[in-house]
């Protein structure tokens, strides 16, 4: 469901030759989030939009509530749906953005226009969310003691080691509110 402001009526300006739905980045992000919540209620979704000179984009992050990535087949369905709302693709061979051909419409044939330039889907929680920190903690637990993680492990040991050492070490990367939420999640989940 979109706000009424997304509907542009024929003749509302001198350039509007037909009624259409303006699918800017903000509206696209909203539609994708609604889709995920409706069809995949166990999936946590973050959908944000950015507008900048020369274009716009939508970032979609999905995970389970414990921070783990969702099943690959579900992620592919979400990505496929999300990518329908991308205006085109960048062709690096000729250094040019190429717009998709054809017209997309709603079920009642109202045209959808002016999509974001890019839609990015990530099978991981949004940075800074509680789910992100839960994912990072589980990642550390899985890799602790390996050669690639010895320096990180030693930093956590300086903060007392274990779950509390990990929390204390990573606190500087969190806002106070995020830290409180992560502490609460650690008490109830881990």
Model-derived features with residue positions:
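Intrinsic low-complexity, intrinsically disordered or marginally ordered coil/linker segments
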Residues: 1-190
């Amino acid at each position: 469901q979109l706000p009424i402001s997304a509907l542009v009526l024929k003749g509302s300006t001198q350039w509007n030759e037909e009624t259409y739905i303006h699918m800017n980045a903000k509206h696209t992000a909203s539609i994708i989030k609604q889709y995920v919540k409706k069809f995949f209620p166990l999936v946590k979704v973050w959908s944000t939009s950015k507008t900048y000179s020369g274009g716009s984009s939508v970032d979609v992050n999905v995970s389970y509530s414990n921070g783990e990535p969702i099943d690959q087949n579900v992620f592919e369905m979400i990505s496929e749906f999300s990518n329908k709302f991308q205006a085109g693709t960048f062709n690096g061979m000729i250094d040019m953005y190429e717009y998709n051909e054809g017209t997309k419409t709603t079920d009642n044939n109202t045209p959808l226009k002016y999509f974001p330039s890019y839609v990015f889907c990530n099978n991981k929680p949004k940075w800074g969310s509680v789910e992100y920190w839960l994912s990072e903690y589980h990642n550390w637990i899985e890799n602790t003691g390996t050669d690639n993680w010895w320096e990180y492990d030693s930093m956590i040991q300086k903060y007392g080691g274990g779950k509390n050492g990990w929390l204390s070490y990573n606190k500087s990367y969190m806002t106070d509110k995020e830290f409180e939420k992560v502490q609460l999640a650690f008490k109830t989940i881990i």
